[in-house]
Amino acid sequence: MAPWTLWRCCQRVVGWVPVLFITFVVVWSYYAYVVELCVFTIFGNEENGKTVVYLVAFHLFFVMFVWSYWMTIFTSPASPSKEFYLSNSEKERYEKEFSQERQQEILRRAARALPIYTTSASKTIRYCEKCQLIKPDRAHHCSACDSCILKMDHHCPWVNNCVGFSNYKFFLLFLLYSLLYCLFVAATVLEYFIKFWTNELTDTRAKFHVLFLFFVSAMFFISVLSLFSYHCWLVGKNRTTIESFRAPTFSYGPDGNGFSLGCSKNWRQVFGDEKKYWLLPIFSSLGDGCSFPTRLVGMDPEQASVTNQNEYARSSGSNQPFPIKPLSESKNRLLDSESQWLENGAEEGIVKSGTNNHVTVAIEN
């Protein structure tokens, strides 16, 4: 077996250690709460009504937590579609060229029909040498998964999976139900934690589980709260974790808010338009993960006119780094109804706005 193959196998095995740790803690918490607290402690003191209420509520949070955690782990990260791969002839020409300018020229021609509106910091086409494809907007190569991931947020060791377009909603729900699960356990255990701590109750076996259960649930609640709050802020801004540290580069320069459509629309991009699915770990995110609508940038009429002329002149040249027409020309429901397509030639697209004198800096999905 080659050393690299052996290393990858070991890496995959070790990657499941954090997941097994979380699984062990969850299984133990289930036993400690249901058996030691509800059955032996609360039901043993003849508090039957409280036992039933606690068990029903606990299992509701437990099922939603396990469901969302399972979906986050076992939902395969979405990869770029075949349109973003170079053809055999393009790949052959690209590999034969040693000049970076010539290589970029090949990539620019290949990207003309793709919905790509961001570049690298050096204004070059974002190309993955390992996957041999042109990276869609917001996609990045994950070294742990060894593939390009659509709208990659981060690789999470606690789920042993990449968090991206296909499972980001599940990841957020996993954090939410983790918080609710830990909060419910800590709040309902607190009464008996105090009784055991003050020796009002003397069952030594249940005492250990109840005391430890309170500390563990409170600790996890505090740690997950900060992470969940941070990701709620990211969703409101329509950013990924990667984009929060390194803003995407558009034709006019880096812009951390380039994909922001407003807080409400940003949330709907992740959770979808159907509110009945928002709290369920069922995929309902909008879009295909390969292209995304961008915000409208306000300009005065003279500046907008000059910008339109410059964009038209650049699109006519052979060195245009951005595509002229996306894969799909269907109007995205997230954008304002004022924005519309105006076809100018066979492959030219200029987006125009009505009363607010806005100009889009990137074409929507």
UniProtKB/Swiss-Prot annotation:
> GO CC annotation: what is one?
Golgi apparatus
What Enzyme Commission number(s) apply to this enzyme? 2.3.1.225, 2.3.1.-
List residues modified as Phosphoserine: 305, 330, 339
Q: Please tell me, according to the UniProt entry, what happens when changing residue 266 to A.
A: Strongly reduced catalytic activity
Active site residues per record: 156 (s-palmitoyl cysteine intermediate)
Sorted alphabetically, the keyword list is: Acyltransferase, Cell membrane, Cytoplasm, Endoplasmic reticulum, Golgi apparatus, Host-virus interaction, Lipoprotein, Membrane, Metal-binding, Palmitate, Phosphoprotein, Transferase, Transmembrane, Transmembrane helix, Zinc
Which leading EC class covers this enzyme? Answer: transferase
For this protein, the parts annotated as crossing the membrane are 15-35, 54-74, 170-190, 208-231
Which segments constitute the DHHC domain? Answer: 126-176
Q: Which residues lie on this side of the membrane: Cytoplasmic?
A: 1-14, 75-169, 232-365
- Which of this chain's residues are annotated to bind Zn(2+) 1? 128, 131, 141, 148
Q: What is its main location?
A: Golgi
List residues binding substrate: 135, 140-143
> A single GO molecular function, which one?
zinc ion binding
The way this protein sits in the membrane is described as: Multi-pass membrane protein
- List the residue(s) that the UniProt entry marks as the site Important for selectivity toward medium-length fatty acids: 29, 181
Q: Which ranges of this chain reside in the Lumenal compartment per its record?
A: 36-53, 191-207
BP terms from Gene Ontology: peptidyl-L-cysteine S-palmitoylation; positive regulation by host of viral process; protein palmitoylation; protein targeting to membrane; synaptic vesicle maturation
Q: For binding Zn(2+) 2, which residues are annotated in this chain's numbering?
A: 142, 145, 155, 162
- For this protein, what reaction is catalysed? L-cysteinyl-[protein] + hexadecanoyl-CoA = S-hexadecanoyl-L-cysteinyl-[protein] + CoA; L-cysteinyl-[protein] + tetradecanoyl-CoA = S-tetradecanoyl-L-cysteinyl-[protein] + CoA; L-cysteinyl-[protein] + octadecanoyl-CoA = S-octadecanoyl-L-cysteinyl-[protein] + CoA
Concerning PTM, the database record says:
Autopalmitoylated (in vitro).
Q: What is known of its domains?
A: The DHHC domain is required for palmitoyltransferase activity.
> Which family, according to UniProt?
Belongs to the DHHC palmitoyltransferase family.
Say what the protein does: Palmitoyltransferase that could catalyze the addition of palmitate onto various protein substrates. Catalyzes palmitoylation of Cys residues in the cytoplasmic C-terminus of EGFR, and modulates the duration of EGFR signaling by modulating palmitoylation-dependent EGFR internalization and degradation. Has a preference for acyl-CoA with C16 fatty acid chains. Can also utilize acyl-CoA with C14 and C18 fatty acid chains. May palmitoylate CALHM1 subunit of gustatory voltage-gated ion channels and modulate channel gating and kinetics.
Q: What is this protein called?
A: Palmitoyltransferase ZDHHC20
Phylogenetic lineage? Eukaryota, Metazoa, Chordata, Craniata, Vertebrata
